Amino acid sequence: MQDFSASPREMVASFVRNRRLISALIKREVLGRYRGSFIGILWSFLNPIFMLAVYTFVFSIVFKARWGTGSDSKTEFALVLFAGLIMFNLFAECVGRAPAAILANVNYVKKVVFPLEILPWVNMGAALFHMLVSVGVWLAAYSIFFGVPSATLLLLPLVILPLILFIMGVSWALASLGVYFRDVSQFIGIVITVLMFMSPIFYPVTALPEEYRGMLEFNPLTPAIEMAREVMFWRQLPDLLVLLQYYLGSMVIALLGFAWFQKTRKGFADVL
């Protein structure tokens, strides 16, 4: 039985070696998701617009929520919330689909020689496309209400990259576990819902009592959400020490997830 390398070098080499295949599969995934609908891929633009409008109405008008900055601006709360939600949605879309990544492509396991490790990258690429659209909607709304965004917005890719590494590590692990344990998909759905409310998306960290703030510090999404808001809305530079720690931690998770996937993939065909 073939042995699959689990080295850090192979994790990078596999992506580079299969980049054209990954790109083609991402395109197929994005277009296929909207195939048959009346307005097609335009839904990818309309969805974040509707989402931003709904959150603005519900939280700023119905609940009259404010972010704790002393400002009464309804659009400020909506844009701060939406910036955090953009980061969370990247995580939720990839991780939510990860347990079925192999199960949905059984033919790749049984009938052809296929680099299965790229399937989580396909989910990531499709999610990044939707994220890019959402950032565009956020940017348009910010420009209308607050003017030209700060140059710190250019640092957003540096904030997103460690989140991508973290998500990929989790996705590789879940893609493998989903083959052997079919209940993983159901469990992950619950975890994602819990994380949504346990992340500083709908409220600032300072809104929690001191004794509960520690819970958010153990949430791996908190640094990404907070730093994204800093560079997107608050016109601040991210804390370099926090960013470096996030990079290192995310790299460890990515390497462990990839190693687990490579070590367990030999049994996929037997289970499927």
PLM feature spans:
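Hydrophobic transmembrane alpha-helices and immediately adjacent juxtamembrane helices
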Residues: 1-272
